């Protein structure tokens, strides 16, 4: 939604300014929201992929009109593979075209005063404050993350959106609307091919060269210092007396500022990212996500869909025969974090 995306940026600036004033910010520049935007990944389609050039252009325009300071435009083939130099150049030139040829960056907040945009902006501010209040009532963001509240809200919204797409309520050009005829299907586009074994070998060779040329004693000392700072932050013994607690509270404050500094110092001595992460894992442990599944959100949007009703009937028949619903393994490979598709299927 082009206008909604512009309004999001405007609402974010208003919220940031209001919140910073609440913290009694002394420097006026602290009231300025600095943002980096990236065009959508999940809006890109494998079907009729050249349409993605237009999608990315319009999404980039929304970010520019919204006042972003930094922008990344996705390549049109990223729904299929890593981008090629050809597709990356189109993505880069999209920004140059909007900036240089169209002059979109010449005016600050060009939609300011528009009745539509002002109303949408204020509505988003109110809705965002409701979400912030919900998080505060949950005990703050850390507690909300532990309870998967933001994650749940995101996945509920994604399921609702996907149901609207699958039911045809929300059109996706080239996918569920205005699909090309068989003889007009876009020809196969060139894709980037990656030799994973070669990439692995190159990385292992690079690490071997790195370790051979560094001061191992200095590296281990830096990692040891990182663990010590992390250990102070992690310590929490309720049996300690108040004086000891006060001393450790001061140490924790220092450690809070020093953790990043120690990590940077370790990197300066050529400790690897894995070694730095491993040192922190030694103290904090490894995070384990709490699995949960949302139910009923998708079905609400698909209640009148005949294909969905047939699927439900098939599941009921299976459950009657086997005493349980069917189980399907959804395996999301890789570590890029793009799990929307897997979550939607689940």
Regions found by a protein language model. Give the residues of each.
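Flexible, glycine-rich loop/tail regions that form catalytic "lids" or insertion modules at the edges
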Residues: 85, 93-96, 100-234, 252-309
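Glycine-rich phosphate/diphosphate-binding loop of Rossmann-like nucleotide-binding domains
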Residues: 332-344
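Compositionally biased, intrinsically disordered low-complexity segments enriched
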Residues: 235-251
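Short beta-alpha connecting loops at secondary-structure transitions
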Residues: 1, 37-50, 56, 71-86, ...
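Short acidic, glycine/serine/threonine-rich loops at helix termini
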Residues: 2-9, 44-50, 73-76, 82-86, ...
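Structured alpha-helical segments in the cores of large, soluble enzyme domains
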Residues: 12-26, 54-67, 90-102
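Gly/Pro-rich turn-and-neighbor structural signature
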Residues: 1-51, 133
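Glycine-rich phosphate/diphosphate-binding loops that line cofactor/substrate pockets in enzymes
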Residues: 232-236, 252-253, 312-326
């Amino acid at each position: 939604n082009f206008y909604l995306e512009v309004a999001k940026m405007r609402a974010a600036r208003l919220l940031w300014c209001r919140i910073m004033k609440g913290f009694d910010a002394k420097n006026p520049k602290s009231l300025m929201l600095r943002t980096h935007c990236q065009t959508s990944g999940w809006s890109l389609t494998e079907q009729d992929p050249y349409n993605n050039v237009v999608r990315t252009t319009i999404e980039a325009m929304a970010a520019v009109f919204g006042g972003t300071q930094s922008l990344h435009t996705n390549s049109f083939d990223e729904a299929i593979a890593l981008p090629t130099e050809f597709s990356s150049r189109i993505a880069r030139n999209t920004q140059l075209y909007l900036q240089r040829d169209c002059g979109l960056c010449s005016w600050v907040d060009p939609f300011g005063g528009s009745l539509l945009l002002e109303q949408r902006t204020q509505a988003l501010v109110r809705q965002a404050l409701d979400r912030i209040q919900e998080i505060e009532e949950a005990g703050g963001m850390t507690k909300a993350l532990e309870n998967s509240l933001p994650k749940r809200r995101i996945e509920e919204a994604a399921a609702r959106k996907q149901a609207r797409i699958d039911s045809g309520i929300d059109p996706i050009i080239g996918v569920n609307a205005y699909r090309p005829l068989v003889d007009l299907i876009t020809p196969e586009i060139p894709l980037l091919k990656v030799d994973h074994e070669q990439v692995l070998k190159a990385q292992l060779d690079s690490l071997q060269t790195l370790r051979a040329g560094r001061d191992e004693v200095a590296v281990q000392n830096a990692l040891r210092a990182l663990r010590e700072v992390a250990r102070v932050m992690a310590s929490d013994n309720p049996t300690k007396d108040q004086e000891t607690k006060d001393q450790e509270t001061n140490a924790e404050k220092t450690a809070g500022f020093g953790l990043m500094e120690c990590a940077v110092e370790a990197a300066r001595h050529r400790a690897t990212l894995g070694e730095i992460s491993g040192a922190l894992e030694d103290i904090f442990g490894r995070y384990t996500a709490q699995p949960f599944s949302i139910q009923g959100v998708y079905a609400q949007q698909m209640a009148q869909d005949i294909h969905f009703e047939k699927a439900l009937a098939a599941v009921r028949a299976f459950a009657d025969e086997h005493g349980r619903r069917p189980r399907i393994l959804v395996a999301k490979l890789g570590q890029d974090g793009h799990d929307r598709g897997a979550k939607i299927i689940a």
